[in-house]
Amino acid sequence: MAEAETRLVIFDCDGVLVDSEPISVSVLVKAMNDLDVPITEEEVYGRFLGRSLATVIETMKTEYNVHPGQEFLEQIRTDLYTRFRRELKPMAGIAETIDTLGIPCCVASSSQVERIRLSLTVTGLIDRLPDIFSATMVKHGKPAPDLFLHAAHEMNVEPANCVVVEDSPAGIEAAKAAGMRVFAFTGGSHANFSGYRAELDRLSPEAVFDAMPDLIHLVRKHKQDGMHL
């Protein structure tokens, strides 16, 4: 059966548009360790990649009996934003890829809108991606489909006509649950942590790629496939 034509590309932000995961994980691990939560960067990658900070906090409460207050959130925000402004880089080739795709694009991320906008501004992508959707806008974050369905609705595109570009297992699950095709991007600096690629393969995305310009061919291939309905 032929696929529906691709009319919208939905990008995750962290680890897809910007190479932020190593910075984010480093900041989170330090903040958790400061509260005597014995967790490593490897564990954070495996358990929380692509998930919201609310999920992290709930895990701290239920598994470690640690109840972080507002100061925990402020520490993360301050440390993260400082390092983003100093260190954050766009994913190699992403600006040119967006310019070449020739179809509407938007961002759907587990992060707060303020953080997404900062990431895109620091890396020079904000003007290319003005349509931003955050997990704070929906009841359930990834791996639930709510965020991607909300983005598609707001962009006036049916789920079947959307392609999601994700780097996390939770994001891939969310895209599939939303009835969208999903391409797994493995070109971020975090892609070599133990078990990462095997977990992505287990979830069977429509494609796996590690160089952002390859997305142009993948989207055009699926766009052409859809035109033969």
Spans of model-derived segments:
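Helix-loop "lid/cap" segments that line or gate small-molecule binding pockets
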Residues: 31-32, 52-66, 119, 152, ...
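Asp-based, Mg2+/Mn2+-dependent phosphohydrolase catalytic module
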Residues: 2-7, 95, 99, 112-113, ...
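Short beta->alpha linker loops
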Residues: 23, 48, 52, 75, ...
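Active-site neighborhood of HAD-like aspartate-dependent phosphohydrolases
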Residues: 2-46
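A short, Lys/Arg-enriched amphipathic alpha-helix followed by its capping loop at the start of a domain
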Residues: 30-35, 93-103
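An amphipathic alpha-helix signature
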Residues: 25, 29, 53-58, 73, ...
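Short helix-capping segments at alpha-helix termini
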Residues: 34-38, 64-68, 124-128, 156-157
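Metal-dependent phosphoesterase signature
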Residues: 38, 58-96
